[in-house]
A protein has these predicted regions:
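Two-metal-ion RNase H-like nuclease active-site motif
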Residues: 1-3
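Active-site-proximal acidic segments at structured loop/helix or strand boundaries
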Residues: 109-208, 218
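Short conserved beta-strand segments at catalytic cores or DNA/RNA-binding microdomains
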Residues: 8-22, 56, 83, 112, ...
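Acidic/histidine-rich, metal-coordinating catalytic segments
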Residues: 50-72
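Active-site beta-loop-alpha junctions of metal-dependent nucleic acid enzymes
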Residues: 9-11, 26-54, 73, 226-232
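RNase H-like two-metal-ion nuclease catalytic core shared by retroviral integrases
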Residues: 57-58, 70-71, 89-114, 129-132
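Two-metal-ion acidic nuclease core segments, chiefly of the RNase H-like superfamily
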Residues: 72-91
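Protein C-terminal end segments and domain termini
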Residues: 211-250
Length: 250
């Protein structure tokens, strides 16, 4: 368990691997969402400076969906196909319930977990000063692992093309009206906002780990995005004003 100044950091890793050289890159994410996949892929392509011809994945819901109920064949999601089209990647996947078809990648997943555990033991602590410090630790571990793989990586890179100059946006854009309770609802989660925004219509950029709220072109708030599909993120400073104006609220 990794902690940030003593607080557990719940997270996953988006792990990308080139099977021939075993070059790998991993980025921290909160879930197996499509935005996590986009962020992890773009971070990996950014490190490589090139793009492969094929993008192979398992049957994560970020990439595929059931064609019909019952666990049969699955099809690629439209968003995933748009991602592949943007980078001119040919999407491929494994058969349902056949993880051995990604044996090399699955093996690298296990090696990565053991490598991180060893580096944390050598570090002497699983606690980090900030999420950025932990991300830098991950990057150092990845760079060290990739050191001996450079010869084969050079062969792979020689067969690749540069990625497009413009990455995909790593957020979804939504609109939300601020309620009389000084809250908005995004993806089934309730978030409080400053009471001065009551009644306003906000543009919300939904990133994998944060929400950015705009009134017109002005960014008025940035809040951490909650995990899960229900709950509330309430800052009492946002709602205490309206409550104080209500007789008997306290």
């Amino acid at each position: 368990e990794v902690t940030i100044t003593g607080t557990p950091l719940d997270h996953l890793l988006c792990h990308c691997v080139l099977p021939y050289s075993n070059w790998e890159w991993a980025t921290r994410c909160q879930s197996e969402s499509f935005l996590s996949l986009v962020g992890g892929l773009q971070a990996s392509l950014g490190k490589l400076g090139k793009k492969p011809r094929y993008l192979s994945t398992d049957h994560s819901s970020a990439a595929t969906h059931e064609i019909s109920p019952g666990g049969g064949p699955r099809a690629f999601n439209p968003d995933y196909l748009d991602l592949c089209e943007h980078y001119d990647l040919w999407p491929v996947t494994i058969n349902v319930a056949c993880p051995h078809e990604h044996g090399d990648v699955e093996s690298q997943n296990g090696h990565l977990k053991r490598r991180l555990k060893q580096h944390l033991l050598l570090r002497g602590s699983r606690d980090f000063a900030s999420e950025r410090d932990y991300d830098q630790f991950l990057a150092r571990v990845m760079a060290a692992a990739n050191g001996p793989r450079q010869a084969r990586l050079a062969e792979e890179l020689s067969a690749m093309q540069p990625p497009p100059p413009t990455p995909l946006a790593e957020y979804r854009e939504l609109a939300a009206r601020v309620s009389g309770h000084s809250t908005i609802r995004i993806k089934n989660i309730t978030y409080s906002v400053p009471s001065r925004l009551i009644g306003q219509r906000l543009r919300v950029e939904v990133y994998e780990s944060v929400l950015k709220l705009y009134l017109g072109r002005e960014r008025v708030l940035e809040v951490p995005r909650a995990c899960g599909d229900r709950g509330a993120v309430i800052n009492f400073r946002h709602v205490v004003g309206p409550l104080l104006r209500k007789p008997g609220a306290f």
